[in-house]
């Protein structure tokens, strides 16, 4: 029962793991290659568990988020460079999330993309500025649950080949021309803003930093929360690929579906109108919830620049949210092709991710920062290997898009 009371921070992070960018990548994977790329969801989830647990570890042991720790322990010029790029990454993330919500509004109500983006922006800002963290946490848990049930419904009415799926989850496969999709699945899972966010929101669970027994207990509960939440994310991402594979994939004439609106429309003649409506409604929930957490991440990063925690009543946090969400919506509003802007935003995330990951590993490996809770040699090696793999794959993604 203690664990159930602790559950929450990991699910907020999971929202970034099932955001509209993941939807597009997963549907492209399932429609183009059937069940063959399910293994990439498994691999990326395992890597994500290591990285997110490590970020939360920092927050529990130090009482500081990744942004605050960088401000405290790195030279000013380096800290400013890292956190400035992290803020830009938060903007790029928010743009993708807002756009996903706008696509859902268009699918459900015929609202134009640019107007829909402004509606999502207003909804998200109202939610963030009028809600305490605990209320947002409960809201996100409800949204994640509804998204999960939505895909249970989609999988239930689709004709899944479970034998092929079981093989796909564990057997690496590299079908011809699949590398861009493989890379996009990974790139949509490990995201910079989530590392900052997790290290901050884990501190919503109060503890005594002077009590080693309390810290050990918090670390145990945090890992269970992270593991449980990432498994939920793995299941939802897998369900997206399963649904796309069962519905859209044609072995003799494979045609990749990489547009969310098109995917929603194609579901109607194949699975019925209810499937299309549920798909769009779940996308709307994903867009709103991931936009909220992207704004929170921006508030966390910006507050940390001034060595302050995320606190919605503080001007630093509010400015951080506004500096994340308004530019993201403005880009959608001002450019001719929002989806072209989305492509460039994802490319920037791929370039920024190594900066955040290696900064985190440096800080959590430092005895000056973490004391006796610094990363062990084996954990350093594992984290460094994951960081190198993620970095190389994200760099490769820049050249194959």
Predicted regions located by residue number:
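Membrane-interface "cap" regions at the ends of multi-pass membrane proteins
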Residues: 1-21, 76-77, 181, 217-221
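Juxtamembrane transmembrane-helix boundary signature
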Residues: 13, 40-72, 81-89
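Flexible loop linkers connecting adjacent transmembrane helices
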Residues: 25-30, 53-78, 103, 251-268, ...
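Helix-loop-helix module between adjacent transmembrane segments
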Residues: 47-55, 77-97, 102-132, 187-188, ...
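Extracellular/periplasmic helix-exit of transmembrane alpha-helices
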Residues: 47-61, 202-206, 211, 231-262
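Loop-to-transmembrane helix boundary motifs in multi-pass membrane proteins
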Residues: 76-77, 114-117, 228, 288, ...
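Hydrophobic alpha-helical segments and their helix-loop junctions in multi-pass secondary transporters
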Residues: 144-171, 186-202, 359-368, 393-401
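A generic transmembrane alpha-helix motif of multi-pass inner-membrane proteins
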Residues: 164, 174-180, 356-362, 371, ...
């Amino acid at each position: 029962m203690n664990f159930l009371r602790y559950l929450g921070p990991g699910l907020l992070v999971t929202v970034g793991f099932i955001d509209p960018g993941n939807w597009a990548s997963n549907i492209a994977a399932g429609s183009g290659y059937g069940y063959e790329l399910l293994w990439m969801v498994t691999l990326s989830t395992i890597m994500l568990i290591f990285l997110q647990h490590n970020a939360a570890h920092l927050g529990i042991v130090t009482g500081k988020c990744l942004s605050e720790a960088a401000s405290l322990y790195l030279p000013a010029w380096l800290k400013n460079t890292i956190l400035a790029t992290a803020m830009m990454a938060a903007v790029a993330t928010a743009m993708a999330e807002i756009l996903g919500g706008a696509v859902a509004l268009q699918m459900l109500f015929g609202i134009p993309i640019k107007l829909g983006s402004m509606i999502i922006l207003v909804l998200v800002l109202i939610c963030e500025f009028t809600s305490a963290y605990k209320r947002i946490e409960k809201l996100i848990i409800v949204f994640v649950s509804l998204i999960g049930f939505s895909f249970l419904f989609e999988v239930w009415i689709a004709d899944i080949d479970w034998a092929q799926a079981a093989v796909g989850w564990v057997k690496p496969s590299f079908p011809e021309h699949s590398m861009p999709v493989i890379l996009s699945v990974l790139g949509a899972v490990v995201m910079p803003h989530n590392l900052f966010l997790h290290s901050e929101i884990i501190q919503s669970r109060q503890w005594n930093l002077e009590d080693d027994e309390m810290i050990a207990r918090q670390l145990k509960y945090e890992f269970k929360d992270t593991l449980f939440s990432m498994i939920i994310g793995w299941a939802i991402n897998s369900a997206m690929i399963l649904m796309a594979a069962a519905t859209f994939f044609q072995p003799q004439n494979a045609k990749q579906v990489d547009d969310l609106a098109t995917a929603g429309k194609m579901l109607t003649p194949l699975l019925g109108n209810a499937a299309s409506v549920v798909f769009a409604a779940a996308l709307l929930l994903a867009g709103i919830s991931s936009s909220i957490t992207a704004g929170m991440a921006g508030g966390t990063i910006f507050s940390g620049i001034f060595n302050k925690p995320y606190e919605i009543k503080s001007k630093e946090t509010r400015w951080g949210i506004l500096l994340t969400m308004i530019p993201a919506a403005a880009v959608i509003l001002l450019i001719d092709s929002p989806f072209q802007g989305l492509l460039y935003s994802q490319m920037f995330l791929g370039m920024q991710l190594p900066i955040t990951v290696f900064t985190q590993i440096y800080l959590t490996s430092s005895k000056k920062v973490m004391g006796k809770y610094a990363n062990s040699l084996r954990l350093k090696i594992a984290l460094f290997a994951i960081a190198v793999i993620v970095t190389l794959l994200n760099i490769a993604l820049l050249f194959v898009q």
